[in-house]
Amino acid sequence: MAGYLIGVTIFDLQEFILLVFGGFLVTGSANGFNQCLEQEYDALMERTRLRPIPQKRISSINAVLFSFVIGFLGFYLLSLIKPHGSFYGFLSKSSAFGLLSLMIYVLSYTPLKRMSTVSIFIGAIPGAIPVLLGWVAATDDFGLAVGVLFAIQFLWQFPHFISISWIRDDEYKKAGFKMMYGGKKGVYPALLAFITSIF
């Protein structure tokens, strides 16, 4: 929403509503698929053990179906925003960025969390895409301003990642996640968190 409100010159309520609900549904879909893939690890961690799938409040297949349906609805709503700026006559730029965000989050970030600390850099990309998606929904274009907004949003996530891995280190190790600076509470991670937070 912030990207839209910063980039828009003439506010369009219908466009804004499509963006809010489309973005909400695509984000929910990505989170749903993530929880389907990580259900056995979520059950091992205090922070995530009460999620619906580990608690058996919803079956895996129903969670996948629900995630697919809301993702499809989200992409449909986003595809209605400036459809004349579509890729190959199918995806609007807004829906293309929504799809890119979901794909990176589910297919790259989620599996990489158990393989390498590189995952936090990958995970910061879909975390920063919403501001880009909002800007493109407002302007149907790119530029230096949105690049700066994307970079700020990208960098602001590192204090978040570092602080969680610092506090929840034992839980992440138990579940097999390789979080950045887990168990290494020194000057370097604290300095990196501080520097990236002032941008």
What are these regions (language model features)?
Residues 2-39, 47, 71-74, 95-106, ...:
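Membrane-embedded alpha-helical segments that form the functional core of polytopic membrane enzymes
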Residues 3-7, 74-82, 105-110, 131-138:
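Structural signal for membrane-spanning alpha-helices in multi-pass inner-membrane proteins
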Residues 12, 124-165, 169, 186-187, ...:
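Functional transmembrane core segments of multi-pass inner-membrane proteins
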Residues 37-58, 159-186:
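Cytosolic, membrane-interface loops and tails of multi-pass inner-membrane proteins
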Residues 40, 103-116, 161, 167:
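C-terminal ends of transmembrane helices
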Residues 47-96, 185-199:
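Multi-pass membrane catalytic core of lipid/isoprenoid biosynthesis enzymes
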Residues 52-63, 107-126, 179-192:
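Interhelical loop and helix-boundary elements at the membrane-water interface
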Residues 80-92, 110-118, 135-141:
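Membrane-interface helix caps and helix-loop-helix hairpins in membrane proteins
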